Amino acid sequence: MRVVLQRSKKASVTVDGEIVGQIPFGLTLLVGITHEDTEKDATYIAEKISNLRIFEDESGKMNHSVLDVEGQVLSISQFTLYGDCRKGRRPNFMDAAKPDYAERLYDFFNEEVRKQGLHVETGKFGAMMDVSLINDGPVTLIVESK
């Protein structure tokens, strides 16, 4: 499992001109799932992201988690994170999980994040989405389970 995490001042996702998810501040997650991922990977990433200290304390040091600052999470499914661009001019997405498996594991992942005590908003799995955010910092990290 691969997640691009962005600390966000605000974020939203729109499908067919309608906002389907938005947060006032917290983390925007682009979530990629490969065919080898399991519920164990999803739980690991959910716990890691929820407790990662990437928000500043009073001294400006990254010392607080999204839980500590009472932030929220906007989670977006993103199969293109497993695009392989090493050969040719078109990405190969063979490492991305099949949609039915990926959707089940993506839903499980979001529930695991909620179990950590976070409010989670999502996009629409498999849809074309417009994602808007103000990246805070900017702080952008890649978190992987393997």
UniProtKB/Swiss-Prot annotation:
Coiled coil region boundaries: none
InterPro entries noted in UniProt: Daa-tRNA_deacyls_DTD, DTD-like_sf
Matching Pfam families: Tyr_Deacylase
Keyword annotations of the record: Cytoplasm, Hydrolase, RNA-binding, tRNA-binding
Enzyme Commission code(s) on record: 3.1.1.96
Keyword set includes GTP-binding: no
GO biological process: D-amino acid catabolic process
Gene3D superfamilies reported for this sequence: D-tyrosyl-tRNA(Tyr) deacylase (3.50.80.10)
Primary localization class, coarse: cytoplasm
GO function term, MF aspect, one: Ser(Gly)-tRNA(Ala) hydrolase activity
Entry superkingdom: Bacteria
Compartment list: Cytoplasm
Motif Gly-cisPro motif, important for rejection of L-amino acids: positions: 137-138
Entry's Gene Ontology cellular component terms: cytoplasm
Presence of the UniProt keyword tRNA-binding in the record: yes
Catalysis performed (reactions): glycyl-tRNA(Ala) + H2O = tRNA(Ala) + glycine + H(+); a D-aminoacyl-tRNA + H2O = a tRNA + a D-alpha-amino acid + H(+)
Record text on subunit structure and interactions: Homodimer.
Domain-level remarks: A Gly-cisPro motif from one monomer fits into the active site of the other monomer to allow specific chiral rejection of L-amino acids.
Family: Belongs to the DTD family.
Function: An aminoacyl-tRNA editing enzyme that deacylates mischarged D-aminoacyl-tRNAs. Also deacylates mischarged glycyl-tRNA(Ala), protecting cells against glycine mischarging by AlaRS. Acts via tRNA-based rather than protein-based catalysis; rejects L-amino acids rather than detecting D-amino acids in the active site. By recycling D-aminoacyl-tRNA to D-amino acids and free tRNA molecules, this enzyme counteracts the toxicity associated with the formation of D-aminoacyl-tRNA entities in vivo and helps enforce protein L-homochirality.
Protein name stated in the entry: D-aminoacyl-tRNA deacylase
Organism: Bacillus cereus (strain G9842)
Lineage: Bacteria, Bacillati, Bacillota, Bacilli, Bacillales
